[in-house]
């Protein structure tokens, strides 16, 4: 141990405690609670001190983007608090002392980039007498540069937060204590050193094995609210770092954190010889929203005005679109009901859309109408019927009740066949066009760390009948650096058909390409059953024919369906030709929103993938109050990690963003930002141009 460093650290700790006592004497209301700003991030991302993690968690829905720099390493990371008990971190590391490869013609002078994923679970929440307890796994699914496991305790007293932990792997490299698990079982005494497979595979055989180290620290909230100070004692000796053996003059690290609104800046001194700094931006995924310019809701009087007929039916029809975003196909009035058939075009929030529509109608509604029925369509499919109790809604909308609840004044159900038969609903036919922005991105490439391609998808189609249409889309590239590619196809000898690893050939063939062109048939088979069939050029790399059936009740947390497709690989030499490779692909698709994981959807696709491998793709999606959805997926098939190649199995992450977060007026629709660490040929599904689960989203809103 470096005693000079130890004495300095101990002196610093005494100063912190004495300062805390003086400050706390004037702030007795602090009690045992830690009076702090938002939890701060450690160097590699995730809530912690400097090099060591703690048991602390951010509030649920917090996303933090981090950049840190400490001489040999640079880190870019994103930490997301999915639940109050689960923290996840994805990270890229720049190892400045090592080249990306030994071949300048392949990667130039670029330095080594490595990716990693961390998770931390809270096992026990802090109470007055008990500390907070957490367990974590760092870099557990990558190449293992910082692979480690830890158990951490955190306990606050006044304006000081105390932390103690034990680490294995990278965090325990110094071996300053005995591994307690070694006393239980001999296999825990030695940590396996081999790299499993092709990387990307969870090294569970290493968990909590080998040398262990204790680490500890304190975080002090100064009387000046934006400033916090940190002191830690770490358990790593940096003897086996990827950047080379690093000199460590002290195991004490000190740092300061300054918070300005949602941005924090930190400065630290590590290993007794290295200065580091970082910048961090926090975003609340629950409350993030864009102020909107939208018309005021129509006032509702209670009791209702007495009238025998509509005061001004034309006014209703005009205001349904301008005030409520509802495009009316047709309407029908019976003895005690007013029925509207149409599309919701602008309002993503179903409750707001329903309230606006009902308010518009009630301003002119005859007194004898007891219920308003709204049949909402997607294309030509009637998906959901809302039955609004007029009297109950009028009281809630006029705030006649102490705690008005608009949602309790209407029900959602499958459209009633007798109600559908009352009106001759005009179906959408004819030409239609559209355009949307696309952005393709890739991280960690040998040519450049960040590579991108952006432009427009230009779509058009013709609806021939209620059920059949022909659709097409062209891809126009406007901005890219894919012209820096120094190879189109890797030289690996893969036993799998190259169903996706020709990707560079496809995306660089031309600035203007045909993305898809296909015929599409859809129909509602029963109250909760939907079907579709399609054929043509289905996606960038494949064409063929397919069909899908889906069972999805209204507002159910469960849906099930299947799809079956026969496809052939498209040529990357032109838009129209095909290669010889063909196959069947299809899946049983299960969609489940478990009650024990609020605002979460699990999707299981079980079947055969494009490379004729068989298995399951599991997709986890978490929605936040703002409408932002964060998801992750992994495909496990009968292809071994050696056959698959680098990455061991298909996995990826995505961020789904509602358009109206960036718009000043209400808008529907979404954009998706994917991150795929490694894309190989195993576990790859067909990118079908239309999916029934998306087409029927209004029946059980998850993304809206």
Model-derived regions, located:
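Membrane-embedded beta-strand positions of outer-membrane beta-barrel proteins
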Residues: 63-67, 78, 88-90, 119, ...
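Outer-membrane beta-barrel biogenesis signature
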Residues: 24-64, 211-213, 290-300, 398-431, ...
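Residues on the lipid-exposed face of transmembrane beta-strands in outer-membrane beta-barrel proteins
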Residues: 65, 76-80, 117-121, 151-155, ...
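N-proximal, solvent-exposed amphipathic alpha-helical segments enriched in charged/polar residues
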Residues: 287-335
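Outer-envelope beta-barrel architecture signal
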Residues: 59-63, 74, 84-86, 129-133, ...
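Transmembrane beta-barrel domains of Gram-negative outer membranes and organellar outer membranes
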Residues: 24-145, 157-158, 170, 202, ...
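Outer-membrane beta-barrel translocator/channel fold
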Residues: 26-30, 90-118, 122, 136-140, ...
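Outer-membrane beta-barrel proteins
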Residues: 82-84, 120-127, 157-159, 220-224, ...
């Amino acid at each position: 141990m470096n005693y000079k460093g130890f004495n300095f650290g101990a002196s610093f700790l005494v100063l912190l405690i004495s300062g805390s006592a003086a400050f706390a004497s004037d702030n007795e209301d602090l009690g045992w609670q830690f009076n702090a700003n938002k939890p701060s991030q450690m160097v590699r991302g995730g809530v912690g001190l400097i090099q060591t993690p703690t048991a602390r968690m951010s509030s649920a829905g917090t996303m933090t983007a981090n950049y840190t720099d400490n001489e040999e390493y640079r880190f870019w990371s994103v930490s997301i608090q999915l639940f109050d008990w689960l923290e996840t971190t994805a990270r890229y590391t720049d190892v400045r002392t090592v080249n990306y490869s030994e071949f300048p013609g392949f990667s130039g002078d670029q330095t080594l980039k490595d990716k990693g994923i961390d998770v931390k679970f809270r096992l026990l929440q802090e109470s007055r007498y008990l500390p907070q307890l957490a367990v974590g796994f760092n870099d557990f699914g990558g190449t293992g540069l910082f692979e480690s496991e830890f158990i951490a305790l955190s306990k606050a007293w006044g304006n000081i937060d105390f932390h103690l932990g034990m680490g294995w792997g990278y965090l325990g490299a110094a071996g300053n204590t005995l591994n307690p698990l070694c006393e239980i079982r001999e296999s825990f005494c030695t940590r396996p050193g081999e790299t499993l497979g092709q990387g990307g595979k969870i090294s569970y055989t290493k968990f909590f094995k080998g040398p262990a180290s204790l680490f500890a620290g304190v975080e002090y909230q100064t009387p000046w609210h934006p400033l916090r100070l940190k002191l830690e004692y770490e358990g790593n000796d940096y003897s086996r770092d990827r950047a080379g053996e690093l000199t460590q003059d002290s195991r004490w690290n000190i740092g300061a954190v300054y918070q300005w609104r949602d941005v924090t800046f930190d400065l630290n001194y590590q290993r007794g010889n290295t200065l580091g700094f970082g910048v961090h931006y926090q975003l609340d995924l629950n409350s993030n929203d864009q102020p909107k310019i939208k018309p005021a809701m129509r006032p509702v009087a209670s009791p209702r005005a007495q009238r025998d007929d509509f005061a001004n039916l034309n006014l209703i029809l005009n205001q349904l679109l301008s005030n409520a975003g509802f495009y009316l196909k047709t309407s029908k009035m019976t003895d005690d009901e007013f029925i509207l058939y149409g599309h919701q075009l602008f309002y993503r929030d179903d409750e707001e859309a329903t309230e606006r529509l009902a308010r518009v109608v009630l301003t002119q509604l005859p007194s004898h109408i007891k219920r308003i029925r709204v049949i909402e369509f997607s294309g030509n499919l009637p998906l959901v019927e809302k039955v609004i109790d007029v009297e109950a809604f009028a009281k809630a909308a006029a705030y006649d009740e102490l705690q008005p609840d608009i949602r309790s004044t209407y029900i959602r159900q499958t459209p009633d066949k007798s109600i559908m038969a009352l009106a001759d609903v005009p179906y959408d036919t004819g030409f239609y066009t559209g355009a949307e922005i696309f952005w393709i991105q890739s991280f960690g490439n040998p040519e450049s760390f960040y590579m991108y391609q952006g432009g427009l998808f230009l779509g058009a189609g013709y609806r021939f009948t209620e059920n059949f249409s022909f659709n097409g889309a062209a891809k126009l590239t406007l901005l890219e650096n894919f012209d820096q590619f120094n190879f189109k196809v890797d030289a690996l000898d893969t036993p799998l058909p190259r169903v996706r690893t020709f990707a560079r050939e496809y995306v660089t063939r031309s600035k203007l390409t045909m993305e898809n062109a296909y015929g599409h048939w859809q129909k509602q088979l029963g109250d909760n059953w939907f079907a579709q069939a399609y054929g043509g050029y289905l996606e960038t790399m494949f064409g063929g024919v397919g069909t899908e059936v889906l069972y999805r009740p209204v507002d159910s947390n469960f849906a099930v369906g299947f799809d079956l497709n026969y496809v052939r690989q498209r040529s990357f030499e032109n838009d129209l030709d095909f290669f010889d490779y063909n196959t069947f692909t299809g899946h049983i698709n299960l969609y489940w929103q478990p009650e024990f994981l609020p605002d979460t959807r699990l999707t299981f696709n079980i079947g055969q993938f494009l490379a004729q491998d068989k298995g399951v793709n599991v997709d986890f999606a978490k929605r936040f109050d703002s409408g932002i959805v964060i998801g992750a997926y992994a495909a496990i098939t009968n292809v071994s990690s050696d056959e698959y190649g680098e990455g061991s199995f298909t996995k990826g992450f995505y961020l789904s963003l509602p358009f109206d977060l960036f718009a000043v007026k209400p808008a529907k629709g979404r954009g998706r930002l994917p991150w795929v660490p490694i894309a190989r040929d195993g576990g790859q599904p067909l990118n079908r141009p239309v999916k029934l689960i998306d087409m029927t989203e209004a029946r059980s809103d998850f993304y809206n």
